[in-house]
Amino acid sequence: MAPYPNWLRNSLLTAWALALPALAMVVPAGTQLQIRLKTKIASNTSKPDDPVETIVIAPVTVNGTPAIPAGVTLRGVVTGASEATDPTVRATLALDFRELEIGGQRIRVHTQLTAVENARESVNDKGEIQGILANETLSSRMDSGIDKVAEKYSGFGGLLSAAKKAVFKETEGDISYDAGVEMDLKLTAALTLTGPPPPGPDAALQPVADPRALVDLVNRQPFQSRAQNPPKPSDITTMMFIGSQEQVQGAFADAGWHQASKLGEKSKFETMRAIAEDRGYSEAPVSILYLDGRPPDMVFEKINNTFSKRHHLRIWLRPDQYQGQTVWVCAATHDTGIDFSAKDRIFIHKIDSQIDLERSKVVNDLLLTGKVQSLLMVDRPNVPRNGQNATGDNLTTDARMAVLVFE
């Protein structure tokens, strides 16, 4: 029998391929999504069915395979909102994120909010945001103390009350999130995606010019900063940046990070106000840590609406160069709460011990800006996997350093 002509064979193969179902990937229920608001929402102004738009800010993988890239759009609506009508009533805000736009498709998703990043509010087991009670804040407790003084010394109590009102603003209990606030969700039902995922921000990355030289450079760097008071080892470095100061500052600004104020009397006073009023302070100062005896050259942070929680990092200029470019190293941690040190009589932050999560946070934020040219993860065999910072928090890391080369 004569063989099939090429045109017929190719036509049959094409028809067979078109008849196959598109390659599908199932993202299981329980998978976490990290998102960033593009829409302002508030318990006292938002209404049911108001649209809410966000972007996914961290890639989602399934068994190591890319599924949902960072940068895709996730849309939702407000499903409920109630005001804090007085200091004893909690504001509430409920959201439903239900449509993922990916690869030119709009796909129905089922999600539940699990956390609002660095927020003073909490999220209950139904995914509803619960506001604070204004009468439970430090400012309100100060009012109670002044009232007790006024019971014995009416004139003095009035003087204290007037002084307090001149310094501190009344705490508002309503929930208000600007564009840029970040949230965590979980899928409540499996999500089926067809076809390959669209490229994420990492698709445009270029290989580093001389990886061996970069590995040597990384492993020559000091790996742990030191505090001055008390003089103890502190944060472990987890990132290196290659580029000018302007490039580094521009990338962090585009990623929504703020430069911290210098530690001084004015910033200390503003910190005290932020704690008392239970609000954010986007340029809050950080304690000074030293690397090779030098204080940080740049400090950035990302805060929502409370001083007690924040992403923050310190960056030190190094004497080295790579491919003729400036070299910086960075230590980043996530403050998850605040405590008072009776010994030092100061407020101190408690941190998430898994510092590699903060490294991933920073890397993902910077990749989304489109200003990173190359990324390399470098092993550091001489860096310990476990340690402590100067205030006694545990530190756990895989010891790798993320090296980002800026465009």
Each model region followed by its residue ranges:
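Terminal, regulation- and interaction-focused segments at domain boundaries
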Residues: 221-251
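Bacterial N-terminal signal peptides that target proteins for export
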Residues: 1-16
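Boundary at the C-terminal end of the N-terminal hydrophobic targeting segment
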Residues: 19-24
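Second-shell loop/turn segments in exported
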Residues: 64, 173, 233-241, 345-353
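A cross-kingdom signal targeting lumenal/periplasmic-facing segments of multi-pass membrane
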Residues: 265-407
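Contiguous beta-sheet cores, especially beta-hairpins with glycine/small-residue-rich turns
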Residues: 25-199, 261, 265, 270, ...
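Compositionally biased P/S/T/G-rich terminal and signal peptide-adjacent segments
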Residues: 203-230
